[in-house]
């Protein structure tokens, strides 16, 4: 007997078509799909169905990356499956180890790609192309996640519709094989914009907060997926070109989102941190997580989860990090973190910020102009203030504890503007331009900053005018400073721009080189040493900007592979670097061996 499961679109909007499956379940060898995709509206329904399957995988994807990274640790409430991820003892029985959730995405994409009539026209426009390209992009993204988690995986591009097809031997590919197989077709469509179905009403939470979904921002831009695959395979210039093309096409700047202490008086000449380590802050940085048609363009792609179980697929991430997004109660917790009293906090949270993360943030300088000063920029040991927003201190009863706020809205970010710019910095650095990478951290990538960016070498300016042409006459106006196109490090450190800030290329690089030397690295005064050190600086910035967003372990392993591919300190230097970062987790496996970075395949 055939068993067809109807696809449900996001937030419980059930499909009116029965021509595709969300979860492939069949009790015979007959094809259970209706291959006809000849209606123009089919594109929207199938695209939402594909994104529904992304929803079903996203919690696992976040937890695999964050539990195995260096920004989290377990506590007394942590469940066994999460503990096993954290100490690298997870077996195929671990509930978060499921390749199936990615192959479900892939098979849905394969079916759509195989059967969609891309020649359907409205006037002179091929109306099915944006959704077709979206299916290609999502499929490539899913394969990329599989390779990150499992190394070498089964690869197929035709839909599986029977038991015999499912059981047939499959071709095996690693990340390089995935790149070779999928990038050529993706490149044909890199200028195609994502589908846009307007704003979707997602209903209201159980405690009465309405939720709207910007449908354009739930899509995966093909250029960004391409850039990520190139970066994963150490093709740095190609990665940088993809990131630049997307930023240029969408005119995405590094916007001004900062955090500053609130004072009832003007900034003094000497700001001392409070002994408690907690600051009341003026917070513009968290505005970047607002998703609305009129909001900031920081969010590029996100996975919005349903407001309750009746409206679609829910997420367990807020609860694991300490927030009860699905409660029906209003908790008037005494919260010292500036959020409203209606926020619901969970003492029994299962994931803690690591001391490594706290130490990294606390070790940063905060830069400010004292009252009435035009040129003086001073330094205070306040630390990076993004931590004060990302990790909040909460008092509940007699217990004080920390919780992470990134998932309080029931959304999971895939791409932010800062994500793209930081990966661009990673690529530019490995191309041989650490000064260009530093510009993204310090000043923001803009031609109008050249007078201030005296650290840029002539060959770097030439590269940024020709190869990655931010500074070309054709593109320079797309990255102006009209809305303060500024460096990412300023989000948490404030005044990093310009020649008067203590945050300068030579000093920051020298500090990191000295740190590496203290760790026993044979540091010399060569361009290659500078590239390796700048890579560590970028890695630190990723920790502070993107903490707990579901990228960390993949970021660490990708960077470790960059280092292994560079002969500077030996072919296993990156693996040793990774193992040192994660040593505090007491992993049961030897992380100096790349094979131990991967999960067992079910």
Locations of the language-model features?
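Elongated scaffold/linker segments in the mid-to-C-terminal portions of large proteins
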Residues: 47, 245, 252-451, 535, ...
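Long, intrinsically disordered, low-complexity segments
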Residues: 20, 102, 210-214, 299, ...
């Amino acid at each position: 007997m055939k068993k067809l499961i109807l696809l449900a679109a996001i937030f419980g909007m059930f499909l009116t078509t029965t021509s595709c499956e969300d979860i492939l379940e069949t009790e015979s060898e007959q094809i259970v799909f209706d291959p006809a995709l000849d209606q123009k509206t089919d594109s929207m329904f199938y695209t939402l169905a594909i994104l529904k399957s992304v929803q079903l995988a996203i919690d696992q994807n976040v937890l695999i990356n964050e539990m195995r990274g260096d920004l989290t640790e377990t506590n007394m409430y942590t469940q066994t499956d999460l503990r096993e991820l954290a100490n690298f003892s997870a077996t195929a029985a671990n509930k978060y180890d499921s390749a199936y959730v990615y192959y479900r995405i892939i098979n849905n994409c394969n079916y759509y790609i195989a059967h969609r009539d891309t020649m359907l026209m409205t006037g002179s426009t091929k109306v099915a192309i944006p959704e077709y390209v979206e299916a290609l992009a999502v499929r490539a993204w899913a394969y990329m996640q599989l390779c990150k988690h499992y190394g070498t995986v089964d690869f197929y591009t035709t839909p599986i519709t029977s038991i015999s097809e499912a059981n047939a031997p499959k071709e095996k590919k690693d990340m390089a094989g995935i790149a070779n197989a999928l990038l050529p077709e993706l490149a044909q469509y890199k200028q195609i914009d994502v589908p846009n179905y307007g704003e979707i009403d997602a209903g209201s939470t159980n405690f009465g907060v309405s939720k709207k979904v910007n449908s354009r921002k739930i899509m995966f831009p093909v250029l960004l997926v391409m850039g990520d695959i190139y970066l994963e395979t150490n093709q740095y210039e190609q990665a940088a070109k993809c990131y630049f093309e997307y930023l240029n096409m969408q005119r995405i700047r590094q916007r001004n989102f900062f955090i500053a202490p609130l004072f009832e008086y003007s900034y003094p000449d000497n700001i001392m941190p409070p002994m408690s380590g907690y600051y009341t802050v003026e917070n513009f940085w968290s505005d970047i997580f607002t998703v609305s048609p009129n909001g900031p363009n920081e969010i590029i792609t996100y996975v919005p989860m349903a407001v309750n179980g009746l409206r679609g697929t829910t997420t367990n991430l807020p609860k694991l990090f300490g927030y009860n997004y699905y409660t029906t109660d209003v908790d008037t917790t005494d919260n010292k973190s500036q959020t409203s009293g209606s926020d619901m906090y969970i003492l029994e949270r299962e994931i803690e910020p690591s001391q490594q993360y706290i130490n990294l943030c606390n070790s940063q300088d905060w830069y400010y102009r004292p009252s009435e000063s035009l040129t003086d920029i001073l330094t205070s040991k306040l630390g990076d203030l993004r931590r004060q927003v990302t990790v909040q201190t909460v008092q509940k009863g007699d217990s004080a504890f920390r919780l992470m706020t990134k998932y309080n809205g029931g959304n999971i970010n895939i791409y932010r503007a800062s994500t793209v710019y930081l990966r661009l910095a990673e690529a530019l650095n490995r191309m041989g331009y650490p000064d260009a990478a530093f510009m993204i951290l310090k000043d923001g990538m803009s031609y109008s900053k050249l007078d201030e960016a005296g650290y840029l070498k002539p060959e770097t300016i030439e590269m940024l005018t020709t190869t990655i042409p931010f500074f070309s006459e054709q593109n320079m106006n797309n990255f102006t400073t009209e809305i303060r196109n500024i460096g990412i490090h300023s989000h948490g450190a404030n005044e990093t721009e310009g020649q008067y800030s203590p945050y300068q290329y030579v000093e920051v690089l020298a500090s990191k080189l000295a740190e590496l030397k203290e760790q026993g690295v044979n540091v010399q005064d060569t361009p290659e040493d500078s590239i390796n050190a700048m890579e560590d600086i970028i890695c630190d910035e990723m920790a502070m900007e993107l903490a707990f967003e579901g990228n960390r372990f993949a970021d660490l392993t990708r960077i470790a592979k960059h280092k292994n591919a560079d002969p500077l300190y030996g072919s296993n230097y990156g693996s040793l670097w990774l193992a040192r970062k994660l040593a505090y987790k007491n992993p049961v496996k030897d992380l100096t061996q790349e094979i131990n970075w991967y999960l067992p395949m079910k």
